[in-house]
Amino acid sequence: AKDVXFGXDARAL
C-alpha cells in the first residue's frame, strides 16, 4: 500500500 498519511500505510485502514 502507499502512504496516505494515516500511519503510513493504506493497509492500516
From Swiss-Prot:
Catalytic activity: ATP + H2O + a folded polypeptide = ADP + phosphate + an unfolded polypeptide
EC number: 5.6.1.7
UniProt feature coiled coil, ranges: none
Magnesium keyword on record: no
The entry's keywords: ATP-binding, Chaperone, Isomerase, Mitochondrion, Nucleotide-binding
Entry's Gene Ontology molecular function annotations: ATP binding; isomerase activity
Localization: Mitochondrion matrix
A GO cellular-component term linked to this record: cytoplasm
Keyword Ribosomal protein assigned: no
Quaternary structure (record): Homoheptamer arranged in a ring structure. The functional units of these chaperonins consist of heptameric rings of the large subunit Hsp60, which function as a back-to-back double ring. Interacts with 2 heptameric Hsp10 rings to form the symmetrical football complex. Interacts with HRAS. Interacts with ATAD3A. Interacts with ETFBKMT and EEF1AKMT3. Interacts with MFHAS1.
Known role: Chaperonin implicated in mitochondrial protein import and macromolecular assembly. Together with Hsp10, facilitates the correct folding of imported proteins. May also prevent misfolding and promote the refolding and proper assembly of unfolded polypeptides generated under stress conditions in the mitochondrial matrix. The functional units of these chaperonins consist of heptameric rings of the large subunit Hsp60, which function as a back-to-back double ring.
Protein family according to the UniProt entry: Belongs to the chaperonin (HSP60) family.
Protein name per Swiss-Prot or TrEMBL: 60 kDa heat shock protein, mitochondrial
